[in-house]
Amino acid sequence: MAKKVDGYIKLQVAAGAANPSPPVGPALGQKGVNIMEFCKAFNARTEKFEKGMPIPVVITVYTDRSFTFETKTPPASFLLLKAAGLKSGSGRPNTEKVGTIKRSAVQEIAETKATDMTGADIEAMTRSIEGTARSMGLVVED
């Protein structure tokens, strides 16, 4: 028989840097999950990512206080800034452009995010990522 689900916790944690301090500790503590067990498992699973890269994670907590978790791909905004070599996007993206990014780089990001996105095809996902780039003040070039 399947375990009964007590709840879900969605967090964004830096790869290889999960520790009991906020936001991880309080979120897991409310559900009675062993915080150190999660931190060790998360850090082991995310060691292949660049250290400090934000990784979305969905933690499923069961009534017996056990848990499973699923890691997602890094946010598109983070990948776009990394590809463009920038620290942050524009505060006024319509008037103030902060950088440029090649369409091929946008396509690579769309392929990376394909497992988490609900696009019909790779072109639709690429257009979605291009929209994110424009909203951050990046110009997409061919």
Swiss-Prot record:
Matches recorded under SUPFAM superfamilies: Ribosomal L11/L12e N-terminal domain, Ribosomal protein L11, C-terminal domain
Gene3D superfamilies, per the entry: Ribosomal protein L11, C-terminal domain, Ribosomal protein L11/L12, N-terminal domain
Subunit structure, as described in the record: Part of the ribosomal stalk of the 50S ribosomal subunit. Interacts with L10 and the large rRNA to form the base of the stalk. L10 forms an elongated spine to which L12 dimers bind in a sequential fashion forming a multimeric L10(L12)X complex.
Top-level taxon of the source organism: Bacteria
Keyword Chloroplast: no
Molecular function terms, GO-annotated: large ribosomal subunit rRNA binding; structural constituent of ribosome
Job description of the protein: Forms part of the ribosomal stalk which helps the ribosome interact with GTP-bound translation factors.
Species in which this protein is naturally found: Shewanella sediminis (strain HAW-EB3)
PANTHER family per UniProt: 60S RIBOSOMAL PROTEIN L12, LARGE RIBOSOMAL SUBUNIT PROTEIN UL11M
Protein name in UniProt: Large ribosomal subunit protein uL11
